């Protein structure tokens, strides 16, 4: 007997568990491919042809992060890689990652990591920090 596992209904569509996994993975891929841009989670949900409220809930259930928070964490991870692995200035990195301003990037980075970007760069190079792939 074939049993269908139904997870949710969104925009009058029935999604099986495998379909949900696929939508979440598609969203994660799109976010990773666009880390140097600004992504609106509502537009991303529309692109995936699902409602934003459903997308936000299911994405958080699967990843532990709301879509916007997940994307912010991707950007911070990329910033860490660039700080340790390149000689680009903090200003260049903040611009590349599409932050509103260098000050905003600096403040957010310090709040999330406990280090300023320059402290992180220095510490990371001294200790050969490798960012874990948790996202």
Feature roles, as predicted:
Residues 1-2:
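Short, small-residue-biased leader/transition segments that mark boundaries at the very start
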Residues 10-13, 62-63:
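Short, Lys/Arg-enriched N-terminal segment that forms or immediately precedes the first helix
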Residues 14-21:
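Intrinsic-disorder/low-complexity linker and hinge segments
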Residues 25-33, 37-38, 42, 61-106, ...:
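Terminal helix-turn-helix DNA-binding modules in bacterial transcription factors
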Residues 47, 51-52, 100-101:
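Short coil turns linking two alpha-helices in DNA-binding domains
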